């Protein structure tokens, strides 16, 4: 019984405890539910608040983006304007630099012109200091007389090239350029300008052009030296008219006239000697002597060209001259026919030395006294006489040799035939030789391969190389 009671009590206790536990559990659940309700409401409120803040941030960001886009557009517009301004400034800078360079060039040119003008003014002052007054009454009369005599023709000396192309001419005498002569109208203005010309101490005789006034009668007679002397006197009288107040000027005038007259006399005598030697020697010797004499003369002394003998192509006279020439050429070993060459070369050398001494004397007139001038005149006269004597000796010896040879009748027929063949063979290659001499600019030197024009620096292809005809 006791056990049952005790079991009943225990079961009751257990049941009571279980009931208490269930009640507690229910209470806890209800509390949790209440807590959950409060927490969800709060959480929703929090979420709403956060959403509002985010919306505000988005709106602010959009505003910032719009503002930044507007600023970017403004900056782009400013950049374009700055670039345009930069281009304008660059163009202006380039224009300014170009103007600066042109102005510098103009400044250099103006400085050069200013220097030239200053030099010209100095020279003008120097010339005005050294001006000597002149009178041109006599020169006017002489110019009018020479203009009324006949038309003046300029004589242009043609350079005759020698056969020996290796020989080169090394003369220091400058050739004066011949100019066409026109009748000079004498006016008061020209006379005033001529009065102010400078009488330099160094007298340039090469400045006067070689003018030959020839009429038909003078050409037929061969009188050329008179026209030359008249024209030279006219030019000298134009430039240097003696003045009573200036003894130095008178001495210069006399010295110049003497040198001119001596040079023209010597030139005429030399041409006569060359004509006589041409009649005696063969065609080869005639060519050599003419070229030799014309080479050695200065350009202001040359006023005649060596003319070939016209009697070579006329009938019986041709045969006689051919006989004499051929015989003289064959028997040059027996008779000393080389003397005319020697005399002629000596004449040419003497002429050259006389010309050089005369030019040197004319240059040193401003320094040397009058005694040295007279001595130079005497020396030139003695040399001209010695050259004349040598030429007459050579002429007499060659004439005697020709007379002795011309008497032999056995050589006549062979000489005539051979000379006819020689004249024909000589006349043919004349034009060819002249053309060959004019074509050749440099003798004995082939054209260099490196001096040719390069068409392209590109390497030639193999096919083109193989096609070459080497």
Curated annotation (Swiss-Prot):
Additional free-text comment from the UniProt record: Shugoshin is Japanese for guardian spirit. Knock-down mutants show no meiotic or vegetative defects and no reduced fertility. Sgo1 and sgo2 double mutants are almost completely sterile and show a premature separation of sister chromatids at anaphase I.
Gene: SGO2
Region Disordered, residue ranges: 131-176, 358-470
Highest rank taxon of the organism: Eukaryota
Species assigned in the record: Arabidopsis thaliana
Pfam families assigned to the protein according to its UniProt record, in alphabetical order: Shugoshin_C (PF07557)
GO terms, biological process: maintenance of meiotic sister chromatid cohesion; meiotic sister chromatid segregation
Residue ranges, compositional bias (Basic residues): 163-172, 382-392
Residue ranges the record marks as coiled coil: 72-113
Family: Belongs to the shugoshin family.
Segments of skewed composition (Basic and acidic residues): 131-143, 150-162, 370-381, 396-406, 423-438, 449-462
Protein name in UniProt: SHUGOSHIN 2
């Amino acid at each position: 019984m006791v056990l049952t009671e005790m079991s009943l009590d225990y079961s009751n206790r257990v049941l009571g405890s279980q009931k208490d536990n269930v009640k507690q559990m229910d209470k806890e659940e209800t509390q949790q539910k209440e807590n959950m309700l409060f927490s969800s409401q709060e959480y929703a409120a929090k979420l709403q608040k956060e959403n509002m803040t985010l919306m505000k941030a988005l709106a602010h960001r959009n505003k910032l983006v719009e503002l930044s886009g507007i600023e970017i557009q403004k900056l782009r517009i400013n950049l374009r304007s700055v670039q345009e301004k930069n281009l304008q400034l660059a163009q202006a800078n380039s224009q300014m630099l170009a103007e600066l360079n042109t102005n510098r060039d103009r400044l250099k040119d103006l400085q050069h012109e200013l220097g030239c003008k200053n030099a010209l003014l100095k020279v003008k002052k120097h010339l005005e200091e050294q001006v000597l007054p002149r009178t041109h009454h006599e020169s006017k009369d002489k110019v009018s007389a020479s203009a009324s005599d006949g038309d003046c023709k300029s004589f242009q000396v043609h350079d005759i090239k020698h056969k020996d192309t290796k020989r080169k001419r090394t003369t220091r005498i400058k050739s004066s350029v011949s100019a066409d002569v026109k009748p000079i109208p004498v006016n008061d203005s020209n006379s005033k300008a001529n009065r102010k010309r400078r009488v330099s101490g160094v007298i340039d005789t090469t400045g006067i052009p070689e003018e030959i006034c020839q009429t038909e009668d003078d050409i037929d007679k061969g009188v050329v030296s008179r026209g030359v002397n008249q024209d030279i006197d006219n030019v000298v009288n134009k430039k240097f008219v003696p003045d009573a107040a200036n003894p130095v000027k008178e001495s210069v005038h006399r010295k110049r006239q003497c040198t001119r007259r001596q040079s023209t006399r010597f030139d005429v005598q030399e041409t006569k000697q060359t004509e006589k030697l041409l009649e005696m020697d063969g065609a080869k010797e005639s060519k050599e002597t003419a070229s030799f004499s014309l080479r050695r003369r200065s350009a202001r002394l040359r006023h005649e060209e060596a003319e070939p003998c016209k009697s070579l192509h006329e009938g019986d006279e041709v045969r006689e001259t051919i006989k004499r020439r051929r015989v003289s050429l064959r028997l040059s070993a027996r008779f000393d026919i080389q003397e005319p060459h020697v005399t002629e070369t000596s004449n040419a050398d003497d002429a050259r030395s006389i010309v050089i001494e005369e030019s040197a004397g004319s240059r040193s007139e401003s320094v040397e006294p009058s005694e040295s001038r007279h001595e130079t005149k005497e020396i030139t006269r003695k040399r001209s006489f010695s050259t004349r004597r040598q030429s007459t000796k050579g002429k007499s010896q060659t004439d005697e040799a020709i007379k002795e040879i011309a008497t032999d009748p056995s050589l006549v027929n062979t000489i005539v035939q051979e000379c006819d063949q020689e004249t024909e063979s000589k006349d043919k290659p004349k034009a060819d030789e002249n053309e060959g001499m004019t074509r050749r600019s440099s003798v004995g030197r082939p054209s260099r391969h490196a001096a040719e024009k390069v068409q392209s620096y590109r390497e030639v292809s193999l096919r083109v190389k193989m096609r070459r005809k080497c």
